[in-house]
Amino acid sequence: MDKFKIDGRCTLNGEVTISGAKNAALPILFATLLCDEEIHLSNVPRLKDVGTTLKLLEMLGATTKVNGNVTVLTGAVNNHVAPYELVKTMRASILALGPLAARFGAADVSLPGGCAIGARPVNLHVHGLELMGAKIAIEDGYIKARVDGRLKGAHILMDMVSVTGTENLMMAATLADGRTVIENAAREPEVVDLANFLNALGAKVQGAGTDTLTIDGVERLHGGSYSVQPDRIETGTFLVGAAVTGGKVTCRKTDPSLLEAVLVKLEEAGALIEKGADWITLDMTGRTLKPVTIKTAPYPAFPTDMQAQFTVLNAVAKGTGMVTETIFENRFMHVPELVRMGADIELQGNVAICRDTEQLKGAQVMATDLRASASLVLAGFVAEGSTIVDRIYHIDRGYEDIEHKLQGLGGCIERIKG
């Protein structure tokens, strides 16, 4: 397995171009199953999860082409089984369920894997599709959906806010007969991006970005072109990198409006922030890093995907900061690794209390999930000495070309092939 070797005590400075958002690109790719015409996508990040999604689409019968941009044609799809071999590596594969059931009346999707940060129940997806008329059985490790004719519009009240649940049901509803209303819907920017994509293909989705979605089903969707929105979590990760190393970094081709909760906390931590329509600059030069109190919650509150990075920020700031995780259980697996580097962090249930650490020390640490791995890389830049981060296949799932981007900012990081 590949690993990263990081030489510490370095400062990140310069400009970095932000990639397209993984969490927007994946549902958009699955949404191509709703249409039998050619679709051209730009700003799709080159990531392991994107490659897995394209492989799954091809296994279902689609034709894909990658040449900088991504072209998908699903007219020849003749298979409705998303097998365990692919689904086990990526939880987002559950997003094939709604489109396959809506367009073909049949979907067999293996129960998902690919993530170690806690249970993400599929019952929300199943219950919503059942309300729309699908008959669903869970057997042999698969969710098996069958539809007699077309799905029917329904009123769906989601028990809890779920991004993938909202996305799956929204996609299915675009081809249902009648109107579907989804209450307690996720408001995340990635949900909005998916809705905008669907509307570009002829869907009728209203209310994206609010907690109530209204979808009027249409007979069919047509082909088209679409550009995936920038990755707000990648943006936030580079900004935290500048903050913890005392540097100055400008993120280009991003959208400041997508991470307001993060920017507020970075300013609270002592950073000077400037922003324009598609750029953000964070300057920490000569400034003192202060701890912050954060509590993760669904958008527009503080994102759970930035929690690990801010745990590092609090660990190296002067004073005591608190991080409360309310979205996922088991999402502090980076903490024992940071403690190995000398961080003074105490876990009390879903709260991490981060106390002033005089100096992190380089160590051999292990990545346990996507965002945890990014936090360990940032900690390595702050630490004294060298840090080895093992199992970086996690980071390759969600950060495009991360070592070269960090090298461009002055980071001393190299990939050691396994």
Curated annotation (Swiss-Prot):
UDP-N-acetyl-alpha-D-glucosamine binds at residues 91, 305, 327. It is found in: Cytoplasm. Keywords: Cell cycle, Cell division, Cell shape, Cell wall biogenesis/degradation, Cytoplasm, Peptidoglycan synthesis, Pyruvate, Transferase. This is UDP-N-acetylglucosamine 1-carboxyvinyltransferase. InterPro entries: Enolpyruvate_Tfrase_dom, Enolpyruvate_Tfrase_sf, MurA_subfamily, RNA3'P_cycl/enolpyr_Trfase_a/b, UDP_GlcNAc_COvinyl_MurA. Its EC number is 2.5.1.7. Phosphoenolpyruvate binds at residues 22-23. It comes from Aeromonas salmonicida (strain A449). GO terms for molecular function: UDP-N-acetylglucosamine 1-carboxyvinyltransferase activity. CDD domains: UdpNAET. GO terms for cellular component: cytoplasm. PANTHER family: UDP-N-ACETYLGLUCOSAMINE 1-CARBOXYVINYLTRANSFERASE (PTHR43783:SF1). It catalyses: phosphoenolpyruvate + UDP-N-acetyl-alpha-D-glucosamine = UDP-N-acetyl-3-O-(1-carboxyvinyl)-alpha-D-glucosamine + phosphate. It is an enzyme of class 2 (transferase). Pfam families: EPSP_synthase. The active site is at residue 115. One of its GO terms (biological process) is cell wall organization. The modification 2-(S-cysteinyl)pyruvic acid O-phosphothioketal is found at residue 115. Its main location: cytoplasm. The keyword Thylakoid does not apply. NCBIfam families: murA (TIGR01072), PRK09369.1 (NF006873).
